[in-house]
Curated annotation (Swiss-Prot):
Catalysis: reaction(s): guanosine(46) in tRNA + S-adenosyl-L-methionine = N(7)-methylguanosine(46) in tRNA + S-adenosyl-L-homocysteine
Binding locations of S-adenosyl-L-methionine: 40, 65, 92, 118
UniProt xrefs under InterPro entries: SAM-dependent_MTases_sf, tRNA_(Gua-N-7)_MeTrfase_Trmb, tRNA_methyltr_TrmB_bact
Name the record gives this protein: tRNA (guanine-N(7)-)-methyltransferase
Organism the protein comes from: Trichodesmium erythraeum (strain IMS101)
Claim: Cytoplasm is one of the keywords in the record: no
The organism's taxonomic lineage, starting at the top: Bacteria, Bacillati, Cyanobacteriota, Cyanophyceae, Oscillatoriophycideae
Entry-linked Gene3D superfamilies: Vaccinia Virus protein VP39
Pfam family, one: Methyltransf_4
Keyword set includes tRNA processing: yes
Family: Belongs to the class I-like SAM-binding methyltransferase superfamily. TrmB family.
Source domain of life: Bacteria
GO cellular component: tRNA methyltransferase complex
Amino acid sequence: MVRVRIRQHVNPLASKYQQSVTIPNFSDIYADIKKPLYLDIGCARGRFLWQMAQVEPEWNFLGLEIREPLVIEANNWRDEKGLNNLHYLFCNANISLGKIFESFPKGILKKVSILFPDPWFKRRHQTRRVVQPKLVEDLANYLTVGGEVFLHSDIEKVAKEMCNRFSAHGSFYRSYNDWLKENILPVLSEREKVTLGKNQPVYRALFIKLEEPTPNIISP
């Protein structure tokens, strides 16, 4: 399949991305809608989830991506492989996450990853970063107790900001105080492979969903 060429950066605050997603019938997509669900926010071309769905067939996988051509391409790859535990959805996660999970059985979301999100380096653009307080709040509402959130970045400031947002909520605790030295997921993302290939650091953190929220310590 010819690789789709797309714009590297998409402004999630643009009006065209403020519309809530049209929800498909997930029971028609997944062979077993009751399997535990792994969510990848900002899945890009979706190759990470494409591999995960094959490595862990007892799970369902959902990738969210704001660049529609990549979603179309990723679902085509899924169909070519005949995977019935994987789907990609075009949406703005900060707008549509709650609506998406109202369409799934309650308590189905067990794991979430946000891997190498767009850093939006300029200060005036940092409100475009994907990990905003609203996103963390939505994940706190739908992730099961004991559920895991994996955060990866090759930019330390971005990784710290993501960690601060989750620590500030009170429904999550960080499982290790320092960065994880190794990737504890069974598959490496495309970006992580490239970063490690250049002998550059990857900043990884794991957060766990608490049963009862703790008082906020860090301001978002």
